[in-house]
Amino acid sequence: MQVLVRDNNVDQALRALKKKMQREGIFREMKMRSYYEKPSERRAREKAEAIRRTRKLARKRAQREGFVSNGRTIAVK
C-alpha cells in the first residue's frame, strides 16, 4: 500500500494511509488473525455474518419500498 507525502505533511499522509487501510479491511483482518480460530468457528462466524448482511439488506429494501418505517418515532400532539 502506498501513500504520497506532499509538502512534507506526514500527518496528512498518515491519515490517508489509515483511511486506506480501514477501507481495505486490514485492521479487521489483523484483529482476526491475532489468535487462532478453529475452522468450524470460522464457518459459523462467516455464516452468521452472511445472515446479518442479508437481513440488513432486506430491511433496507423494505424500508426503501415503504413497507417498514425507518425506526424513528414521531411525537404527535
From Swiss-Prot:
Query: What is one Gene Ontology biological process annotated in the Swiss-Prot or TrEMBL record?
Result: translation
Return one GO MF term.
structural constituent of ribosome
Gene3D superfamilies according to UniProt: Ribosomal protein S8
Keywords on record: Ribonucleoprotein, Ribosomal protein
Q: Name one GO cellular component term.
A: ribonucleoprotein complex
Pfam families registered for this protein in UniProt: Ribosomal_S21
Q: Which family does it belong to?
A: Belongs to the bacterial ribosomal protein bS21 family.
List, alphabetically, the NCBIfam families matched. S21p
The name this protein goes by in its record: Small ribosomal subunit protein bS21
Record organism: Bartonella tribocorum (strain CIP 105476 / IBS 506)
